[in-house]
Amino acid sequence: MGNETYLNHPTFGLLFRVCSVEDNRELFTTLYAQRLFFLVKNQGSLAFELLTRSDARMVVESRMRQLRRQGIREELYELQRVHKQTFQ
């Protein structure tokens, strides 16, 4: 997860990727305020689903549980750092 990924939203401007959720789905937040969160689905075209901060937190925590079960430590540690920085 060492790569930083950005995406330009037509209304909210530059978004920063928080994490990959599953195939073709990633969680993004607004770059500066980190108050708006979007679940972005990429299946030929981009679809943005607005999430509340608490829903975004649940998505990240669910992904951390999944990584823990799969034993993917490096990505888990990076996501724990992002979780702490973003939600605490």
Locations of regions flagged by a protein language model:
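Short, compact, well-ordered microdomains
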Residues: 52-88
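Long, non-catalytic architectural segments outside compact domain cores
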Residues: 1-55
